[in-house]
Regions:
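Conserved beta-strand hairpin/beta-sheet module of binuclear metal-dependent hydrolase folds
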Residues: 1-46, 117-132, 137-138
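Rhodanese-like catalytic fold shared by cysteine-dependent sulfurtransferases
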Residues: 142-143, 155, 202-238, 242-244, ...
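Active-site neighborhood of phospho(di)ester-bond hydrolases with catalytic His/Asp-centered motifs
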Residues: 26-27, 47-56, 74-79, 106-109, ...
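Metallo-beta-lactamase
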Residues: 101, 111-228
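Active-site metal-binding motif and surrounding structural segment of the metallo-beta-lactamase
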Residues: 33-75
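Active-site metal-binding loops of divalent metal-dependent hydrolases
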Residues: 29-30, 55, 79, 111, ...
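Core dinuclear metal-dependent hydrolase active-site scaffold
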Residues: 2-6, 16-19, 95-124, 128-129, ...
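Divalent metal-coordination and catalytic microenvironments
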Residues: 18, 28, 54, 66, ...
Length: 470
């Protein structure tokens, strides 16, 4: 028997590959199937089952393409309803893979169909729990995402989650290894640990949600402090339930090279968003007017979903040479399949063609230090509120990037402000969005708070001084 965790940092997501006796199972696969196909071929095994822990909201699973290419059966937990062929398992149902077994544990709460998969080894020992979004390391799945489809409140779903965890998971042996679907950085939880696997015994000791005195306290703790989910989550759920275009077709369409004239014409005719995925430094120096920057060198896919929102938005790509396929692949993971092509030769080709360009007004933290001491200034901090509360520039306002589509209309076009994030990655995104919407009354700080913290600019770490602009 072999268990392999295939972890994707950009999504903080874990897929699992299990082999035994010439057969294999994959749990919660990503959209692109070729890496799995290659593993199967290398190991000389036949994929028998594709297990889905639930209808994922934060990414589009590869279950359909993988099933088409391997003839493996797709398995969901009880109550799941799909528009494609799938085995809807019963609670406690056993599936055999070679010499091992997988038992379905129906654990509703995060969603109604949410299920964990308990691995029983060749000797009959319960050895691993693939816990999906039911149990994370340090946290549990948020119970607010399925309210509409379940016709239940988040408190009612949290109550179901309590029953699932306390009656089905906690009675399991301490030595069982827990393999969750997500780790730190995922929007599917609020308090996840950085580790990607642990023993159930250690989680029983350290996970706050597993140490509540009763259901009421559990509901209160689990629902407290939940941030609104990204808008694209609902669309990803529908794609996972109903189906989607083949990844191969999406990739073929997205990898259409376009010379500047073609690129410009398609942008005008289609209304496509020009998405520039270069680093924030390269983008700030020069870019195609109206384009939006979300760099591949960071949490690319989640930010695309948070900022672009509509998965049906046509997209044209500007990338560094050789990064086109990675960009299309990572977009498809969160359901953005309408990539119409990429700018052949990248931004350099656009410049050489003599077409109009734009740039971000960016200054160094040293220059910012001089200016802040010379005059009264307005400062916008677009980091998460938790980062701001930990430490921030004295008198800075908190406006998290995740909510830019809500707060940008509050900006006074004639009032200048300085803007920063943690390192420059997020503030360049914000700058590109602001300039695309016609705002040019700001200066972005290179290197973000990390660089600013090395200067003498006054800082504060008192939460009571938080200034949040609605």
């Amino acid at each position: 028997m072999k268990i392999e965790q295939i972890y994707t940092g950009c999504l903080a997501q874990g897929a699992y590959y299990i082999t035994s006796g010439g057969e294999a199972a994959i749990i919660d696969p990503l959209r692109e199937t070729q890496p799995y196909i290659e593993r199967l071929k290398k190991d000389g095994v036949q994929l028998k089952y594709i297990f889905e822990t639930h209808f994922h909201a934060d990414f589009v699973s590869g279950h359909l393409d993988l099933s088409r290419k391997t003839n493996a059966s797709i398995v969901y937990g009880p109550t799941a309803q799909t528009e494609f062929d799938a085995i809807i398992a019963e609670d406690q149902q056993i599936f055999e893979i070679g010499d091992v077994k997988i038992k379905v544990l129906h654990t509703p709460g995060h969603t109604l169909e949410s299920s964990c998969y308990l691995l029983i080894d060749e000797s009959g020992n319960e050895t691993a729990l693939f816990s999906g979004d039911t149990l994370f390391l340090g946290d549990v799945g948020r119970p607010d995402l399925a309210q509409k489809s379940a016709d239940m409140t988040q408190n009612e779903l949290a109550g179901l989650l309590y029953e699932s965890l306390y009656h089905k998971i906690l009675p399991l042996a301490d030595e069982i290894t827990v393999y969750p679907a997500h780790g730190a950085g995922s929007a599917c939880g609020k308090n996840m640990q950085k580790e990607t696997l642990d023993t159930l015994g250690n989680q029983k000791k350290t996970n706050y949600a597993l140490n509540q005195k009763d259901k009421e306290s559990f509901i209160k703790e689990v629902t407290d402090g939940l941030l609104p989910p990204p808008a694209y989550f609902g669309m990803n759920v529908m794609m996972n339930k109903k189906g989607y275009d083949s990844f191969d077709e999406v990739l073929s369409q997205g990898l259409q090279p376009l010379v500047p004239e073609q690129f410009e014409e398609i942008a005008e005719v289609s209304g496509a968003l020009i998405l520039d995925v270069r680093s924030n430094g390269r983008f700030a120096e020069g870019f195609i007017p109206q384009s939006v920057n979300i760099g591949l060198d960071g949490d690319f896919a989640p930010w695309v979903g948070a900022l672009i929102v509509d998965v049906n938005q046509p997209i044209l790509l500007v990338t560094e040479k050789g990064e086109e396929e990675e960009a299309v692949t990572r977009l498809s993971r969160v359901g953005f399949d309408k990539v119409l092509g990429f700018l052949e030769g990248g931004f350099d080709a656009w410049k050489k063609s003599g077409k109009e360009t734009d740039a971000v007004h960016r200054i160094s933290p040293e220059q910012f230090e001089k200016e802040i001491h010379q005059k009264e200034v307005k400062i916008i901090d677009i980091r998460r509120e938790s980062e701001y509360n930990a430490e921030h520039i004295h008198e800075a306002y908190s406006k998290p990037l995740a909510y830019i589509n809500e707060w940008l209309h509050t900006i006074e076009p004639e009032e200048h402000f300085y803007m920063h994030c943690g390192s420059g990655y997020r503030s360049t995104m914000a700058a590109s969005i602001l300039q695309a919407r016609g705002y040019r009354n700001f200066t972005e700080i290179e290197g973000g708070f990390r660089a600013i913290s090395l200067t003498s600019i006054p800082k504060s770490d008192f939460v009571c001084q938080t200034k949040i602009l609605k």
